[in-house]
C-alpha cells in the first residue's frame, strides 16, 4: 500500500495507487481504520487536499482526487449565496422588502405609492397568498405589508414580525387606494421600481435581477445609493467554474464540516413545510391525494412530500423555506425528494449531505443559463437535479449522472411557467416522475443519444441549450402568457 514516488518539476511527488478490495466490507473496514488512526501527514497519498473521505465508486476501486482549492472556496460561496431562508413566495416578498426599505428612507408612512413591476413580477405575484397576512393576495398587498410592518434587515423573511395592527393598517390603506400598480416594460425579468410619496417628499427605489438586489435609491431627487450590478453582478462567487464534473468532484470531496450546518437548515426547514403541507389544509391537498391514490413506494412519497411543501408555500404558509436560485419551489424540489429517498433507504447522513450539495449546485448551474425568472418552469431544473442526485446517492458513475440529466431534458424541457400558484405543486410532482424515470433508465445503462432533439454530446452542453431556449427562445412565449393572464 505504500505510494509510488515520481519526480515532477525536480521535486518528489506522491502519486496514488488504486486500491482494490475483495468485498465492500473489507473496503469499509480498511477505510475506517485508516481514517481513525492516521493523519493527513502520515498518509498524504490517501487523503485529498480538502477531503474527509476518499471518493470511491461502487466497483471496489478507490479513486483518490485532489480538489481544486478555488473550486472548493467558490462553490461554498455559491451555496451560501443561493441557499437562504425565505418566508413565502419570493416575488411578493421582494416587493415587501422593497417597500420596507423605501419606507425606512422616507421615514414615515406614505400617502401615495406607485409600484412599477415587470411582466414576470406581475405573473409571479398575482395568484399566491402572502405569508403572515391572513390570506392577502396581490402586488399592492405585498408592497403595503412591507411598508407598514416589514423589517428590511430580515431580507427574505421581511414579513416575519407583522402584527395584527400592521395587517389592519395595511388593509385600510389598500381600501383607500394608496397603492397603484403600473406595468414596467423592461427586458429585465425581475425588475421593480417603487415610488413612495409623502406630501412633497418622494423616495424611489429600484431592484433588478435578484430579489434583494437594490440598484438605486433616491430621495427628493438626491441619490442615496447606487450600484451598477448587472445580471449576475450581485454574486460574489465565480459561477463560471460550475460544471457537472466539478460539481461531482466538489460533492465527493468537500469536508462535511464546511457544508453540514447549511444543509441541516435545508433539511429542517424544507422537510418541516413538507410535513405541514401533508397535515394542513392548503390548496387541493395534492400531497395527501398522491400518497393515498398511488401504490405505496419511495418514488410516490418523494412526489407527495415535495408537492405538499410547495402547495403549503404557495398557499400562504408562514414557515420558512431554504430557497435555491431565488425560488422556494426550486429549493423544495431540489432537496425534499433526495431527503425522503435517503431516509426511506437508510442511507447515511454523510452521503445525504453530499447528495444535497450536488443537487443544490446542479440546480444553480442550470438556472445560470435560464435566469431567475422566465417562461421556463423551474420545477424541471430542480427535479432534474434531484433525479441526478439520487443517481449520485446510489454511487452512480459520472456517465450515469450525466445520462440522468439528459434523459430528463429529453423528456420535459418545454414546461411553461405561468406564474407562481398552488398548481406549481403538480408541476413538481410531474417533473419528479420524469426525473425518476430518467434515473432508472440511466442506472440500467439506457440513455437518449446526442442529436435526439436538442440533446448534445455532453450534459453541460444540453443544459446550456435548454437554458438558451428558456431565456431567449421563450421570450415571446413569456409575453403571451402575461398578456393572457392580464386579460
Feature roles, as predicted:
Residues 67-76, 109-122, 297-316, 349-366, ...:
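Acidic-glycine-rich active-site phosphate/pyrophosphate-binding loop
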Amino acid at each position: 500500500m505504500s505510494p509510488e514516488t515520481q519526480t515532477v518539476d525536480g521535486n518528489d511527488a506522491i502519486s496514488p495507487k488504486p486500491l482494490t478490495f475483495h468485498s465492500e466490507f473489507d473496503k469499509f473496514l480498511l477505510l475506517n481504520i485508516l481514517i481513525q488512526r492516521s493523519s493527513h501527514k502520515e498518509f498524504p497519498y490517501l487523503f485529498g487536499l480538502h477531503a474527509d473521505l476518499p471518493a470511491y465508486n461502487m466497483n471496489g476501486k478507490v479513486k483518490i482526487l485532489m480538489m481544486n482549492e478555488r473550486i472548493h472556496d467558490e462553490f461554498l460561496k455559491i451555496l451560501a449565496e443561493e441557499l437562504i431562508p425565505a418566508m413565502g413566495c419570493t416575488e411578493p416578498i421582494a416587493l415587501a422588502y422593497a417597500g420596507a426599505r423605501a419606507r425606512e428612507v422616507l421615514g414615515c408612512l406614505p400617502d401615495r405609492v406607485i409600484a412599477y413591476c415587470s411582466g414576470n413580477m406581475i405573473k409571479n405575484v398575482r395568484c399566491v397568498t402572502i405569508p403572515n397576512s391572513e390570506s392577502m393576495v396581490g402586488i399592492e398587498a405585498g408592497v403595503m405589508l412591507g411598508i407598514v410592518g416589514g423589517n428590511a434587515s430580515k431580507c427574505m423573511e421581511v414579513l416575519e414580525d407583522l402584527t395584527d395592527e400592521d395587517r389592519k393598517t395595511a388593509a385600510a390603506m389598500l381600501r383607500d387606494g394608496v397603492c397603484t400598480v403600473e406595468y414596467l416594460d423592461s427586458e429585465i425579468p425581475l425588475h421593480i421600481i417603487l415610488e413612495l410619496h409623502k406630501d412633497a417628499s418622494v423616495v424611489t427605489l429600484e431592484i433588478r435581477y435578484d430579489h434583494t438586489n437594490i440598484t438605486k435609491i433616491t430621495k427628493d431627487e438626491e441619490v442615496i445609493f447606487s450600484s451598477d450590478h448587472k445580471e449576475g453582478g450581485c454574486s460574489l462567487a465565480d459561477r463560471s467554474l460550475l460544471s457537472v464534473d466539478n460539481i461531482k468532484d466538489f460533492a465527493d470531496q468537500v469536508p462535511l464540516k464546511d457544508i453540514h450546518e447549511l444543509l441541516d437548515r435545508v433539511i429542517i426547514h424544507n422537510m418541516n413545510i413538507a410535513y405541514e403541507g401533508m397535515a394542513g389544509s392548503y390548496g387541493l391537498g395534492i400531497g395527501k391525494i398522491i400518497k393515498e391514490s398511488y401504490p405505496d413506494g419511495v418514488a410516490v412519497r418523494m412526489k407527495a412530500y415535495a408537492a405538499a411543501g410547495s402547495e403549503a408555500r404557495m398557499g400562504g404558509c408562514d414557515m420558512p423555506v431554504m430557497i435555491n436560485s431565488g425560488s422556494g419551489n426550486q429549493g423544495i424540489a431540489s432537496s425534499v425528494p433526495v431527503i425522503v429517498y435517503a431516509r426511506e433507504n437508510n442511507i447515511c447522513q454523510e452521503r445525504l449531505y453530499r447528495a444535497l450539495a450536488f443537487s443544490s449546485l446542479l440546480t444553480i448551474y442550470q438556472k445560470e443559463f435560464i435566469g431567475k425568472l422566465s417562461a421556463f418552469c423551474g420545477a424541471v431544473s430542480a427535479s432534474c437535479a434531484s433525479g441526478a442526485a439520487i443517481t449520485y446517492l446510489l454511487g452512480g458513475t459520472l456517465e450515469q449522472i450525466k445520462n440522468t440529466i439528459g434523459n430528463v431534458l429529453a423528456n420535459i424541457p418545454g414546461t411553461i411557467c405561468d406564474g407562481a400558484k398552488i398548481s406549481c405543486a403538480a408541476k413538481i410532482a410531474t417533473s419528479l416522475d420524469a426525473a425518476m424515470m430518467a434515473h432508472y433508465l440511466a442506472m440500467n445503462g439506457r440513455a437518449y443519444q446526442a442529436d435526439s432533439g436538442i440533446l448534445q454530446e455532453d450534459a453541460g452542453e444540453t443544459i446550456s441549450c435548454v437554458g438558451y431556449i428558456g431565456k431567449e427562445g421563450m421570450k415571446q412565449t413569456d409575453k403571451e402568457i402575461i398578456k393572457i393572464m392580464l386579460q
